[in-house]
């Protein structure tokens, strides 16, 4: 009996929304394989690092993820399953941080745009674009600066030991 966990590659860092989608669809027993780009995620199948991929093909607000469709064709891969993941953004800071003490917020540009109301309510906040939502949490926590916060999902806060300063800060709850 093969007891090795299924290895699932995803684009992003541990705590990313795609990792949450993989675990939600396939269960906690999988081994997640983070990759920095979609190209590297798809390459994980060919180089034997992963058995499956979890990649977004569409976002209800941003539309189709065209690069993923191109890579599906380039690698001759087929979609085997689908899941819908609600995208809920949290404002995440270091332990000891307070909402009143925040002076900068970082995240992927799409996440920053999806949380415009929160950010606009705090004109003193500097916006800092990042490559990845979960990666922005990792960076904020690594710096330990209580005046910095990141926008990402709850999974990233738990993974990196961040504190959720505000929950569900996205402008549109119908983001999947």
Per-region residue spans from a language model:
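Domain-level signature for soluble enzymes in the chorismate/prephenate branch of the shikimate pathway
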Residues: 1-176
């Amino acid at each position: 009996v093969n007891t090795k966990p299924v290895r699932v590659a995803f684009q992003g860092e541990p705590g990313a929304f795609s990792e949450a989608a993989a675990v939600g669809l396939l269960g906690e027993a999988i081994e997640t394989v983070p990759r920095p780009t979609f190209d590297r995620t798809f390459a994980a199948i060919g180089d034997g690092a992963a058995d499956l991929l979890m990649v977004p093909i569409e976002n209800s607000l941003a539309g189709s993820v065209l690069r993923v469709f191109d890579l599906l064709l380039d690698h001759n891969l087929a979609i085997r399953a689908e899941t819908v993941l609600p995208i809920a953004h949290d404002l995440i800071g270091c332990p000891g941080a307070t909402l009143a003490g925040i002076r900068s917020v970082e995240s992927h540009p799409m996440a920053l745009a999806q949380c415009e109301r929160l950010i606009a309510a705090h004109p003193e906040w500097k916006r800092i674009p990042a490559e990845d939502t979960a990666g922005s949490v990792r960076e904020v926590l690594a710096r330990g600066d209580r005046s910095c916060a990141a926008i990402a999902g709850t999974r990233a806060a738990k993974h990196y030991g961040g504190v959720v300063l505000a929950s569900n800060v996205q402008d549109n709850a119908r983001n999947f």
